[in-house]
Structures are given as structure tokens and as C-alpha cells.
Amino acid sequence: MAALTQNPQFKKLKTWYEQHGSDLNLRRLFEGDRDRFNRFSLNLNTNHGHILVDYSKNLVTETVMQMLVDVAKSRGVEAARERMFTGEKINFTEDRAVLHVALRNRSNAPILVDGKDVMPEVNRVLEKMKSFCQRVRSGEWKGYSGKAITDVINIGIGGSDLGPLMVTEALKPYSSEGPRVWFVSNIDGTHIAKTLATLNPESSLFIIASKTFTTQETITNAETAKEWFLLSAKDPSAVAKHFVALSTNTAKVKEFGIDPQNMFEFWDWVGGRYSLWSAIGLSIALHVGFDNFEQLLSGAHWMDQHFRTTPLEKNAPVLLALLGIWYINCFGCETHAMLPYDQYLHRFAAYFQQGDMESNGKYITKSGTRVNYQTGPIVWGEPGTNGQHAFYQLIHQGTKMIPCDFLIPVQSQHPIRNGLHHKILLANFLAQTEALMRGKSTEEARKELQAAGRSPEDFEKLLPHKVFEGNRPTNSIVFTKLTPFILGALIAMYEHKIFVQGIIWDINSFDQWGVELGKQLAKKIEPELDGSSPVTSHDSSTNGLINFIKQEREARS
């Protein structure tokens, strides 16, 4: 595929931007078109609640949107989408299909990889998860002393941690009958030490999530957990009642002491950051119940069908992707803020930090050449209204344009004080996107100062600081309620957005070679930290850091 910058449709878009981009003014666009909201929004009726995607507060016209859609079509988005859904090995650097969509394929329509339908295996593992969840949640599954399981500890890292953690936090209101869940990911001993300090080994169940069962951080933490457990249990055979594995390496799992019957497998066509729908989601199913886990899958499947069958012009993941292309590749924006106005979604931005940045943080195209355009954005964010009192200042009056996605449910899980808290939250959500769009003119700021009775001297001093340029782009994503179904749909929507952008940029969104180099060097450095001999085998900075650590350790020992 030719470089994006050589694509005729993109060149047309870029020329239009250079000629007209600086004239786009959101306040004027709204004043000149009373129907703008209706023409630049999608109301998705899932039959389990609505998802409204309002993109009218973006620096776009119908002409711009059509040019963006033309770019998507010319880059082969529709054909690439079908290749993914039909099991082609689109992750070509690892020779793998990309089939997280198969994990939530509620239609059970066959999906073939190398001529074999994967759905029977997917359903077999789901049935095994269902049976296990029912045994644990009912109290039938007992620990070594006969106690039921009260706490589940998921030990994993990256995709084996971020997804289940985000979802179990988001669906806390659905967890009342399930065990508590804990997540240990960091190799920093503090993480597992602080977690284990609160637990009773007799009623704890550890989930060890590692495809190869060789991930250094995960296996080190798992061995620490096993040592802690055996201090109480004494008998190594008790491990089988308290440890299960999410893996494909039967030999290593058995060697650890886990009964292979308690190993839940997944497949090489499941990428880590897309794996919460697989056995990696076992902690989710245990916490909220398998019925709710199935609802999560069903919501994602609904969005998969919307993405696969809806024309690009009305396709939510596609439109979100194209707006990102517009800001990154024309306006030069470098970051994207995800701002959920729901405390249960407090890990949503962190989850898609990995989802987006590990997928599209690439500078090499599929043909092996270096891109001459920007690719994946820096993704960040915090829940509202906390962010308003932290970093919104820069979004409103800073020198950088930061496109933002604002998300909120219409219905709160906790309508306390007759809904007062949620009404205030909704008001802030609505006010922020309007303020970012409209801004505050010099004349409006002047009238405000006059009404406040400020002196003429104050006028001169304060007026420039009270002006807001506005014209800051936002998407508003409003949904009926944060249910398992709606959460599944929202996650899938962003997954597909990332996919579309990767196709347009001609990069492989499904490998992650960038994480490997640091791991390789860490293996070399680890033995060099032993003893007191000075290290000289690296650059002067790395040598200096290693030797400082060794000297300080010696001095304190």
C-alpha cells in the first residue's frame, strides 16, 4: 500500500485543511446550522439500552466527513474488516489471525482458521468457565480446610491484568454474590506483599494468567503466592484447590502444581490486549457471575455486528477513527483524552492506553518502510469531575489542541439524595463540552466583569485571562446505564476504532515488538546486580546507575 501521504483522497483532505482548516469555528458552525446535532450524531439502539455518539462538537463539515470516509474506503478499511472477521492472518509479523471477535460470537456462525472452525473450542472453554464459576460462587468448591472461596487473586500483567481489572471495577454493582477480586501485576514486591497481607489462604483462589507460563513478572509473583500459601497449607497437594491457570503450556502448569483440569486455555489468535473476552476474563466471571459475563460478550457482539454491517458513514467505530485521523494527521494533535463521567469507569482510560498505544504506537508500515506521518496518539484521562480540578485548565486555555471523548450514563447505579449527585455530574459533563466548544469571547468576559462590579483597573488586568478561545473538539458518548451489555459494546467500539486507524496508517495493530528490547536487556542486567564489583559493560549512564545502586545497597547492608 502506498504511503498515506501519497493517497489521492488523503491529499485532497490535506489540501482542504490547508485552505480552510483555520476558518473552522464551532460556535459559528452551530449558529449557522440549527440541525447540526441531528446531522452529526448517531443513536445506537442496542435493545439493551441506547448509546448516543454525538460528534457535532468537532471541527468538521459534511464535506470534511465525506472526504474522511473516502480516505477510509481508499485505504481498504472495508476489505480489511472482512479479512479480520473471516480469520485471515492479518497479524502477519506473527503469522496469526486476529479473532477476539470469535470469543464473543454469540451467533455461533463458523469462523475458520486454517480451514478449522474455532467456535467449538471457544464454546468448550466458555462451558468450562461457566461450570467452574458456578462451583466457586455456590460454595461447592472448597479450599484445603473445607472453607468456601471468598477472595480471588488474579496474577498477570498487561492484557492479563488491565482488562479484567477495568471490567471488574466497572461492574462492581453486579458483584454482590461473588467473591472479592484482587489484581497483582507489578514485579515490585510491594504489590503482592500488600495484597497477601489482607488475605486468608484457606479461602483464597489464585488465578495465574500467562499464555506461556514463563512471563517473568507473573511467574515470580505466582511462586511468591505459592510460598505464602504453603506456609499455612503445608501440603503441596493443596495447591490444586487454590491455584488455577489461564495458559496453553500444560507441562509448565503441571510442574507448578496446578491440576491440568484447572487450566483454562486460549489461543494464539487472541492478542493480550484483546483477551478479556477469553479465559483471561475468568476473574470477571467469578466476580459478577457467568450470566453477566455472557452479557458483556453479547454487548461486544452487538457492536461487532454494527461495525461489520453498517455503512462507513453511519458506523460509530469508523467515525471515531476518522475524527482521530483528522486531528492527528491534519491538525497535528498528539494526544487524546478519555474522560468518563462515571467513577466505576476509573480504569477505562488506562485500559485503552494499552489498547491504543500498544496497537498503534508503530513507525514501520506493513511493507517495512518508515512512515512519514504521525500514527497512534498518546491516550490518557481520568474520571470526571476529578479531572476538572486537575488538568482541564490546559484543555481549555493551554497551547495544545486535545480532542476529548466524554462518556456518561443517563442512569446512575447510585441515585442517592433523590438523584442529586448524578444531576450535578450530568450538568458538569454537559457544561464542559459546551464550554470547550463555545469558549468565552472578550465581550462576554467584559460583561461578566462589569456585572461583578470590578474596577476599570481590574478590567485591564483580568480581561485577557477571562477569555476562552473555545473551538476545542469533543465527542459526547451518552448511554442509558453502565450494564455488562453496554460496557461490552463500548469496549468493542473502541477496539474497532483502533483497528480502523491502523488500517489507514498501514501498520500492524496486533503485534508489540516494542516491548521486547527492554525485556531482553533486563535479563542481561539482572545478574550484573549481584555482588559488589563495578559494572563497565554498558554506556556510562547505565554503568553509573548500576554502580550507584550497588554502592548504596552495600552501604546500607
From Swiss-Prot:
Its EC number is 5.3.1.9. Keywords: Acetylation, Cytokine, Cytoplasm, Gluconeogenesis, Glycolysis, Isomerase, Phosphoprotein, Secreted, Ubl conjugation. PROSITE patterns: P_GLUCOSE_ISOMERASE_1 (PS00765), P_GLUCOSE_ISOMERASE_2 (PS00174), P_GLUCOSE_ISOMERASE_3 (PS51463). Pathway: Carbohydrate degradation; glycolysis; D-glyceraldehyde 3-phosphate and glycerone phosphate from D-glucose: step 2/4. The modification Phosphoserine is found at S107, S185, S455. It catalyses: alpha-D-glucose 6-phosphate = beta-D-fructose 6-phosphate. InterPro entries: G6P_Isomerase (IPR001672), G6P_Isomerase_C (IPR023096), Phosphoglucose_isomerase_CS (IPR018189), SIS_dom_sf (IPR046348), SIS_PGI_1 (IPR035476), SIS_PGI_2 (IPR035482). The active site is at E358, H389, K519. D-glucose 6-phosphate binds at G159, S160, S210, K211, T212, F213, T214, T215, Q354, E358, H389, K519. The modification Phosphothreonine is found at T250. It comes from the Eukaryota. SUPFAM superfamilies: SIS domain. One of its GO terms (molecular function) is cytokine activity. Homodimer; in the catalytically active form. Monomer in the secreted form. In the cytoplasm, catalyzes the conversion of glucose-6-phosphate to fructose-6-phosphate, the second step in glycolysis, and the reverse reaction during gluconeogenesis. Besides it's role as a glycolytic enzyme, also acts as a secreted cytokine: acts as an angiogenic factor (AMF) that stimulates endothelial cell motility. Acts as a neurotrophic factor, neuroleukin, for spinal and sensory neurons. It is secreted by lectin-stimulated T-cells and induces immunoglobulin secretion. Belongs to the GPI family. This is Glucose-6-phosphate isomerase. It comes from Bos taurus (Bovine).
